[in-house]
Structures are given as structure tokens and as C-alpha cells.
């Protein structure tokens, strides 16, 4: 079985692998669509904590066809078309019982692809606990839409959930890469009234406006905090979602956040051990400003609800895809694109049908 793997630090290449055994509750799938993520880039070329295992296949964003199921699987059969969530936890753990399935064995370990086993950039791949971790692909949801639901949509929307956005809230969205754009779309669907997006690339600005951004703050045009405060008549924003940025982003978010506001962060600060916070913007700890950051939950129920939003026309996740490929081997080129991030890129994807 061939797959695209992290051979060692900074080396991406093809390997032959053996799949994990299909247990009684598991499934074996073959990809119909795949997309690389910034997390894959971190794993190969960065400082990601998820895995440093050699010769491990990367990838955790896919839609697929079920090839084989274990004899205890009830709701899926060979031939079914499915969305494969990026987060496929072990649901038989205490953290899962407590509502944190994404951390089933410790921080972020619900992303079992790459963390514990080969990922989805292979001719076939293994999915644990299929009834809980696969989602049926609705007939009227395209492969392009579905592969963006598997990680980008669920992660971005989680930022809006963490921020507890309420109808009428003014929201600042830091970062308009693929996750940031999904955070923005999540804010729109949750009822934000005035959405301010921070970013500069024209291709992303266009999609940000289509997803509901009312104002765009370009950090090349001046201080980000000053621009947001000007757009809100000095009041600041009720909520902030962070889907992109750098070490300084959290302090900027605190600076524009009203007293009592909430920040929802899904940005992975790769390689940054210490994140600075401006004490004054946090009221030196007394401003009742809440910082919440996390990995999105996983599993079937969440995927199927998100797919409903797409199926019934509330939202089109496929707008993220700017570079599309059609051969299995093209996933390597897509990975390099995701690493290099040309200005006309939001998200590459490989669509095999």
C-alpha cells in the first residue's frame, strides 16, 4: 500500500505500508478526495507535537469510499461514501465521557491520524470505531464541499463556538487563511452583526466578503488594533475569533476586545513556546476577558450536522479550494503548495472522481 509520508524531519516522500488490522468496530476506506492542512506542514517541516515518527503517512482531511468493515459495525457497509473527520477519537475513554473526545489520550490525541497511525494520504486507510467516527456523505454535497467539512469547517466553526458568539455581536476575525475564513463563516451563521476580518491576500479577501465580512483590515496599511478601534468608534468588539496570525496576535485580540468579551482561538502557535500578552489590554488580569483555545471535537454527529448546513444551502465550503488536482500522486504537489503558500492559494485539494 503506497502513501505519502514524513520520512524524517524536513523530508516528505512515498513509502509502502501495511494497514492496521480492521477490528470488529473499524473500517478500511479508500480516498475519494484529500486535502493537505497546515498541520501536515507542521508535522513534516515544523515543530508539531503530534508526531515525529519516521515513515508515517500524513494527512487527516478526506472523503472516502468504505472498502471493508468489521463485523460489529452497524451503520456502514462497503461502497458507502463517507466524510472522514480529522478528529477520530477513542470514544471509550474518560476524557470522551467528559466532553473532550478530542483529547482522549492527552492533548490533541483525538487526531489519531498521524499521531498514532498512518494518515489518509494512502491508497487505503484505517478508521477506528467506524459507527462513531465516519459520517455519511449526503447525496447533494460534493466531494469538494465534503473534504473542506472534514477539518477546515469543523475547526473554524469551533472558534466561533469557543467565542460564544451571540446574535448581534460585533466580531473581529484574525486571519483569513482557510481556517480563519471558516471561523468568519461560523461567526456569520451564529448571528454576528458586524464582522471585521484581518488579512491582505486578494484571493482570501474576496472569499471573506462572500462569507460575511463587512470590513477588511490590512495590517500593511497601519496598526491592526488602531484600525479595528476606528471601525468600531473606539468601542472594540464583543468577540474575537483567531484562525491565523503570529505570536503577537493574542495581544492584539485582547486589545480590541471589550470588557467581558471572549476570544475563541484555534490557531496553532507552532514553535512558539511563550505567547506574550499585553497586561494593560487584559486589565492586568482584571478585565473579565476570557481566552478560550482548543482542538475541535470529532466524530460522526458533528460532521453530519455541519454537512447539513452545506446540503441545505446555508453555506458553501468549497469556496476555499483554489488549486484542484485529479490524480492520487498529486497530493505531493498539493503538500508543497500548502508549505510554500503562494499568494493565490487558499487551499489545494485532490479530487479523484
What are the functions of these language-model segments?
Residues 209, 214, 246-314, 352-353:
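Glycine-rich phosphate-binding loop and adjacent beta-alpha segment
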Residues 83, 238-241:
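N-terminal Rossmann-like NAD(P) cofactor-binding module of classical short-chain dehydrogenase/reductase
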Residues 82, 136-221, 226:
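Mid-domain Rossmann-like dinucleotide-binding core that forms the NAD(H)/NADP(H) cofactor-binding site
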Residues 90-174:
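NAD(P)H dinucleotide-binding glycine-rich loop of Rossmann-like/cofactor-binding domains
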Residues 20-34, 47-97, 118, 138-141:
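Glycine-rich beta-strand-centered segment in the early N-terminal region that forms part
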Residues 1-3, 251-255, 299-353:
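C-terminal hydrophobic helical "lid"/dimerization subdomain
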Residues 224-234:
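Short amphipathic alpha-helix with an adjacent loop that forms part of the alpha/beta core around
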Amino acid at each position: 500500500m503506497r502513501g505519502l509520508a514524513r520520512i524524517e524531519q524536513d523530508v516528505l516522500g512515498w513509502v509502502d505500508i501495511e494497514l492496521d488490522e480492521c477490528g470488529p468496530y473499524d473500517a478500511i476506506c479508500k480516498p475519494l478526495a484529500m486535502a493537505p492542512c497546515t498541520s501536515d506542514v507542521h508535522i513534516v517541516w515544523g515543530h508539531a507535537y503530534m508526531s515525529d515518527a519516521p515513515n508515517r503517512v500524513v494527512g487527516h482531511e478526506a472523503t472516502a469510499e468504505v472498502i471493508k468493515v468489521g463485523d460489529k459495525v452497524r451503520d456502514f457497509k462497503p461502497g458507502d461514501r463517507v466524510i472522514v473527520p480529522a478528529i477520530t477519537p477513542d470514544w471509550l475513554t474518560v476524557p470522551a465521557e467528559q466532553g473532550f473526545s478530542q483529547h482522549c489520550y492527552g492533548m490533541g490525541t483525538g487526531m489519531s491520524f498521524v499521531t498514532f497511525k498512518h494518515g489518509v494520504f494512502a491508497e487505503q486507510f484505517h478508521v477506528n470505531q467506524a459507527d462513531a467516527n465516519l459520517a455519511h456523505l449526503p447525496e447533494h454535497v460534493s466531494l469538494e464541499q465534503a473534504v473542506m467539512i472534514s477539518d477546515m469547517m469543523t475547526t473554524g466553526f469551533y472558534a466561533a463556538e469557543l467565542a460564544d458568539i451571540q446574535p448581534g455581536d460585533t466580531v473581529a476575525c484574525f486571519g483569513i487563511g482557510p481556517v480563519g475564513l471558516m471561523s468568519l463563516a461560523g461567526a456569520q451563521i451564529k448571528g454576528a452583526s458586524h464582522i471585521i476580518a484581518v488579512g491582505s491576500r486578494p484571493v482570501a479577501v474576496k472569499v471573506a466578503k462572500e462569507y460575511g465580512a463587512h470590513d477588511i483590515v490590512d495590517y500593511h496599511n497601519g496598526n491592526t488594533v488602531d484600525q479595528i478601534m476606528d471601525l468600531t468608534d473606539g468601542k472594540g468588539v464583543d468577540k474575537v475569533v483567531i484562525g491565523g496570525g503570529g505570536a503577537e496576535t493574542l495581544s492584539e485580540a485582547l486589545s480590541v476586545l471589550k470588557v467581558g468579551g471572549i476570544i475563541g482561538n484555534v490557531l496553532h502557535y507552532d514553535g512558539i513556546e511563550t505567547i506574550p500578552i499585553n497586561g494593560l489590554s487584559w486589565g492586568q488580569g482584571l478585565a473579565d476577558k476570557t481566552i478560550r483555545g482548543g482542538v475541535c471535537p470529532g466524530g460522526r454527529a458533528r460532521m453530519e450536522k455541519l454537512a447539513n448546513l452545506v446540503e441545505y444551502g446555508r453555506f458553501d465550503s468549497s469556496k476555499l479550494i483554489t488549486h484542484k488536482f485529479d490524480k492520487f500522486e498529486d497530493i505531493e504537489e498539493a503538500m508543497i503548495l500548502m508549505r510554500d503558500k503562494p499568494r493565490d492559494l487558499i487551499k489545494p485539494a485532490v479530487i479523484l472522481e
